[in-house]
Swiss-Prot record:
Native source organism of the sequence: Emericella nidulans (strain FGSC A4 / ATCC 38163 / CBS 112.46 / NRRL 194 / M139) (Aspergillus nidulans)
Domain Protein kinase: 567-818
GO molecular function: ATP binding; histone H2BS14 kinase activity; MAP kinase kinase kinase kinase activity; protein serine kinase activity; protein serine/threonine kinase activity
Protein name as annotated: Serine/threonine-protein kinase ste20
Taxonomic path: Eukaryota, Fungi, Dikarya, Ascomycota, Pezizomycotina
Gene that encodes it: ste20
Reactions catalysed according to its record: L-seryl-[protein] + ATP = O-phospho-L-seryl-[protein] + ADP + H(+); L-threonyl-[protein] + ATP = O-phospho-L-threonyl-[protein] + ADP + H(+)
Length: 848
């Protein structure tokens, strides 16, 4: 059929079909077996694939009211003519295509099951079918059949034929291949050629019974709803608000009653024992809340700064330091104003062997149990051991616990407390999580951060993922630095240098000599790098690395050899929690040295030992205690240092009255040491008289680097609470960011020590001291009128509350007060007098 005849047929046929009166068949005609015009598909009609029909939105049956029976009229195996298409049309269809072979594209083009079900009981709608066919069988020129408006198609409503028969499962189903426009079939491509044999199967889905309507569909939808409800849908997820939330600790202040609300019992007791009056609490309510939160955070955990004031066994990490005695203790009963009894050597647990001054009287606090875990105020009397930083600051070099004076060892600074592995100024140790408690005094390992190692001192965010990142950064950043440290160690031990065995037995008393293996070197480098790596917002810090890791790192930095064969005539001058301090003489030079022996198994913070060694190794200066060497001897670590026989400045200020020129000389030497540390990016953070050592000649040197922290360009401020409370700068107490200027404030407080014999607020409890530092700012000086104007001006610049306005070490070294400095040998008489007074005090107490 050519295009012209087809076009005329396309536009003429619907009109003749739709305007023709429907045949006058009754419902019985549909069931007649003699019907010659069946709706079965003609053998030559093409079969289209189910997939193309199923994917088409248009291929849906249109419901009609023409049939009201429960099954479609097309499902009846009737021989009668179609009620809509006359017999003439059917005859035309047969005549046109009886001789034409079936197109090769024989995939069945039928309605999906759902559409099939919808057709059941619906009348045959030729208009909807034609629309679907036109959509799928359109020719390349996009010509499509546009059915006339329904108003023009139907001039008479077709009769409502109703079938009285039951559906036959094998009956013909409505198929998109049924059409009255055979030419359209030619629009489909002939993929296999026109000579493809015709498929003799007339009904492509004969074997598939028609799905019965009714309950089965509702069951299916119900089942689907049930499955969806069980599996859940992303869109349906709803997160409810928390139920019955409970705020365990929420402190507030009631302005009407002037009372704090929600105070835990421990806080209430601390406030009662602190000596802070109700009026003071009402005047600065927010400051009180901040201090209590600060105090609570630092008073918990196994390395608390406040626990260093408690009475507890030193080996217990969470226990408070046994140093502080109950209120009635004779140890602290006397004021430091009486030289014979006031200066007190810290107990063994205090890592440093300096002579701390007598602790302040306990404000109306009842004597505290020796092993109290909570730090009652009375037990908080500081032994002058600096606290460890609680919060995580990037690149924080952990500081070891503050010095503890054992017997009268001037090396309290070489305290047996675990010397932190403070990195050399170039290293920055991993930051300590903000939640990390300050070190207890007994531990004196006040290390803020763990040694860097594979197990990293930092908190693991996603612990494993963060740790991996840190370890990767570790191995690269500090390669050169680690080599530098190793070379320095070798150069210092040239005389004793000997080949080391491959392995070093841990349990043997003598340290076998063995060169660090590549693994050890890599581990050391990794640990150093870890310190330099910036820390993410720290969660709680991980458990400290095991003893084997620490030993491996120590092996890499310690000198091989047996120290017992290198030093002789050891004389114990002090005792710490985990070891003692000895004087000894070197075999080849007969020089007197100080040796700090530490039992690694007794160190609460083994990682911190490396911190101090590294800082001292890299800080060679005339005003910094000289680190000589370190050895591993069995289970002990021996740290050999320069011996400062004069002891600490604490004894000098306790038993003597110093003149301004002498004070100026001490300040100048201290500032020189600080300037050197600051130039390397290191903050000491624990400057006080206990950490200033003197020789008999009056030479002055800084010691106790356990609290040192690393700062750099990217992290030039810290916000961790470190140092002993009485020497803390206001920005540290209020937990603001701070930098090098905190050492300048501590120097100013130490100058007041040299004037008055003790720092401000020493007779106050630590909690009240924190309150006074935060609220008063620059402390008042007794008898300030007796000071020279130049000295007052020096103190004014050193004790500025605003760190931005506070002078630097470089500025103070140029201050006119430095012109008053006395020669260092003028300090020698003070040192000797202090030694005599100390010996007398010890004799009165029965000798220690």
């Amino acid at each position: 059929m050519n295009n012209d005849s087809f076009s005329s047929f396309k536009f003429r046929r619907p009109s003749s079909k739709l305007h023709k009166d429907p045949p006058g068949y009754g419902s019985r005609a549909l069931n007649s077996q003699q019907s010659t015009t069946s709706l079965k598909r003609h053998p030559s009609a093409p079969v289209y694939p189910r997939s193309s029909a199923a994917g088409s939105r248009e291929h849906l049956r249109t419901r009609s009211n023409a049939y009201g029976s429960s099954s479609s009229s097309l499902d009846q195996n009737s021989a009668g003519a179609s009620p809509v298409l006359g017999s003439s049309d059917s005859g035309h269809f047969h005549s046109s295509h009886s001789s034409r072979s079936r197109p090769p594209y024989s995939g069945r083009f039928s309605l999906n099951d759902q559409s099939s079900d919808e057709l059941i009981g619906a009348p045959f709608d030729s208009r909807g079918m034609l629309s679907a066919l036109e959509e799928h069988t359109a020719e390349p020129d996009n010509r499509s059949y546009q059915p006339p408006d329904p108003a023009e198609r139907y001039t008479e409503k077709p009769p409502n034929f109703r079938s009285q028969t039951t559906p036959n499962p094998r009956a013909l189903r409505q198929s998109a291949s049924f059409t009255t426009l055979p030419p359209r079939m030619e629009a489909f491509p002939n993929a296999a050629g026109n000579d493809r044999p015709t498929n003799t199967k007339r009904f492509s889905d004969e074997a598939t019974p028609v799905r019965p309507p009714g309950p089965s569909r509702s069951k299916k939808s119900s089942f689907s709803s049930f499955v969806n409800s069980m599996l859940g849908s992303p869109r349906g997820i709803k997160i409810s608000a928390p139920e019955n939330p409970v705020h365990v600790t929420h402190v507030g202040y009631d302005n009407q009653t002037g009372q704090f609300t929600g105070l835990p019992k421990e806080w209430q007791r601390l406030l009662q024992e602190s000596g802070i009056t109700q009026k003071e609490q009402e005047e600065h309510p927010q400051t009180m809340v901040d201090i209590m939160r600060f105090y609570e955070k630092n008073a918990r955990g196994d390395d608390e700064v406040w626990h260093k004031f408690d009475h507890a066994y030193p080996q217990q990490p969470t226990a408070a330091s046994p140093i502080s005695q109950p209120a009635g203790s004779t140890t602290y009963g006397t004021q430091r104003t009486s030289p014979p009894t006031s200066p007190r050597f810290p107990q063994n647990h205090e890592g440093s062997f300096e002579n701390p001054r007598a602790p302040p009287p306990i404000p109306r606090a009842a004597p505290i149990a020796a092993h109290a875990m909570s730090p009652p105020l009375g037990g908080l009397v500081p032994n002058r051991a600096p606290p460890k930083p609680p919060t995580a600051a990037a690149n924080l070099v952990p500081s070891r616990p503050a010095p503890q004076p054992p017997t009268s060892s001037p090396y309290s600074n070489i305290s047996t407390r675990p010397s932190p592995e403070t990195q050399s100024p170039q290293f920055s140790t991993p930051p300590i999580p903000e939640t990390e408690p300050l070190p207890s005094e007994s531990q004196r390992s006040r290390s803020n951060s763990r040694t860097n190692g594979a197990q990293g001192p930092w908190p693991s965010v996603s612990p494993s993922h963060y740790q991996q990142q840190q370890e990767q950064a570790m191995a690269v950043a500090q390669q050169a630095l680690a080599n530098k440290q190793l070379e320095r160690s070798r150069s210092q031990r040239q005389q004793q240098q000997s080949p080391r065995p491959d392995q070093m037995p841990i349990a043997q008393p003598a340290l076998p000599q063995h060169a660090p293996s590549p693994e050890d070197v890599a581990l050391t480098q990794a640990s150093q790098t870890a310190r330099a790596a910036p820390a993410a917002r720290p969660r709680q810090r991980p458990r400290q690395s095991n003893a084997m890791d620490v030993r491996a790192r120590l092996v890499a930095i310690c000198t091989p050899g047996d120290p017992t064969k290198l030093y002789y005539n050891l004389n114990k001058i002090g005792q710490g929690a985990s070891g003692g301090v000895f004087t000894a003489y070197e075999q080849h030079t007969n020089n007197c040295v100080a040796i700090k022996q530490m039992n690694l198994d007794l160190q609460p913070k083994k990682d911190l030992i490396i911190n101090e060694i590294l800082v001292m190794k890299d800080s060679k200066h005339k005003n910094i205690v000289n680190f000589l060497d370190s050895y591993l001897h069995g289970l002990d670590l021996w740290v050999v240092m320069e011996y400062m026989e004069g002891g600490s400045l604490t004894d000098v200020v306790t038993f003597n009255i110093m003149s301004e020129p002498q004070i100026a000389a001490v300040c100048r030497e201290t500032l020189n040491g600080l300037q050197h540390l600051h130039s390397k990016g290191v903050i000491h953070r624990d400057i006080k008289s206990d950490n200033i050592l003197l020789s008999l000649d009056g030479n002055i040197k800084l010691t106790d680097f356990g609290f040192c922290a690393q700062i750099n360009d990217s992290q030039n401020k810290r916000n961790t609470m470190v140092g002993t409370p009485y020497w803390m700068a206001p920005e540290v107490v209020t937990r603001k960011e701070y930098g090098r200027k905190v050492d300048i404030w501590s120097l100013g407080i130490m100058a007041i020590e040299m004037i008055e014999g003790e720092p401000p607020y020493l007779t106050e409890s630590p909690l009240r001291a924190l309150y006074l530092i935060a609220t008063n700012g620059t402390p008042k000086i007794k008898d300030e009128h007796n000071l020279s104007p130049v000295f007052k001006d020096f103190l004014h610049f050193a004790l500025r509350v605003d760190p931005e306005k506070r002078a630097s070490a470089h500025d103070l070294l140029k201050h006119p007060f430095m012109n008053l400095c006395a020669p260092l040998n003028h300090l020698s008489p003070l040192v000797k007098a202090a030694r005599i007074s100390r010996a007398q005090e010890k004799a009165q107490k029965g000798g220690v």
